[in-house]
């Protein structure tokens, strides 16, 4: 199965060799070093960058030489922001999450450490569960338990 658009979250964009169209994070201050590392890896440039405003304000004062768009966020980690960008700004009808398990043991991609905060970020996902279930599937962890895996039938179904 081919995907129309690929969005990467946070530091995964450094290591993803695919031609991605959008890079999304809570941490816009890291776009510049991440982009340099991606370039050093010889991967294609990513043309669009997104960061969130959290509860109405920028998460941090961020100065970056890389221009990025913003989207309002109620929280839920960078994984939720990527869902919001895909659905609300890009009009995605179906979203497949890869590497967004939202579990303590799933850790964070670039640290290799347990992610104790994972449980705290789930509240937004839980509040939006019924809505998200209509168009989100996941390959791993708690998000897979909540939304199911993407089947070929689901991927190829209309809507």
Label the model's feature ranges.
Residues 1-159:
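Metal-ion/cofactor- or nucleotide/acyl-coenzyme-handling active-site neighborhoods
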């Amino acid at each position: 199965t081919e995907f129309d658009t690929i969005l990467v979250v946070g530091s995964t964009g450094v290591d993803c060799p695919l031609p991605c169209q959008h890079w999304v994070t809570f941490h816009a201050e890291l776009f510049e070093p991440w982009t340099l590392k991606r370039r050093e890896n010889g991967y294609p440039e990513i043309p669009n960058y997104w960061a969130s405003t959290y509860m109405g304000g920028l998460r941090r004062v961020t100065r970056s030489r890389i221009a990025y768009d913003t989207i309002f966020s109620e929280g839920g980690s960078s994984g939720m922001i990527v869902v919001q960008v895909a659905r609300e700004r890009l009009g995605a009808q179906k979203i497949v999450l890869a590497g967004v398990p939202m579990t303590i043991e799933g850790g964070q991609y670039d640290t290799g450490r347990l992610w104790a905060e994972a449980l705290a970020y789930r509240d937004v996902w839980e509040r939006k569960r019924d809505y998200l279930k209509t168009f989100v599937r996941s390959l791993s962890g708690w998000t897979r338990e909540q939304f199911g895996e993407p089947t070929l039938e689901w991927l190829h179904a209309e809507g």
